[in-house]
């Protein structure tokens, strides 16, 4: 299942998000950096990090736990 972690440079919450993805067994995901993209910054600026399921566009906003990620992936 294709996943994207939406993040920005110098995001102090992104490292813990990576840890929760690892705890959920998620090893493969793309990163989308919002820096410098006005539309993405407007949409995600205060929400990051956000995990997006590419197949249906569903999004899981931070904070999330490993268990929340597993439930999100289960659909």
Report each predicted region and the residues it spans.
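Local sequence-structure signature of Cys/Sec-based thiol-disulfide redox active-site neighborhoods
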Residues: 1-23, 29-31
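Thiol-based oxidoreductase modules, predominantly thioredoxin-like and allied folds used
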Residues: 27-38, 45
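Structural micro-motif
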Residues: 45-52
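Non-catalytic, surface beta->alpha helical segment in thiol-disulfide oxidoreductase systems
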Residues: 55-75
């Amino acid at each position: 299942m294709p996943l994207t972690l939406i993040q920005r440079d110098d995001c102090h919450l992104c490292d813990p998000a990576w840890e929760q993805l690892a705890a959920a067994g998620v090893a493969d995901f793309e990163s989308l950096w919002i820096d410098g993209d006005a539309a993405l910054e407007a949409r995600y600026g205060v929400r990051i990090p956000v995990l997006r399921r590419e197949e249906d566009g569903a999004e899981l906003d931070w904070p999330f736990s490993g268990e929340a990620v597993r439930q999100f992936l289960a659909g």
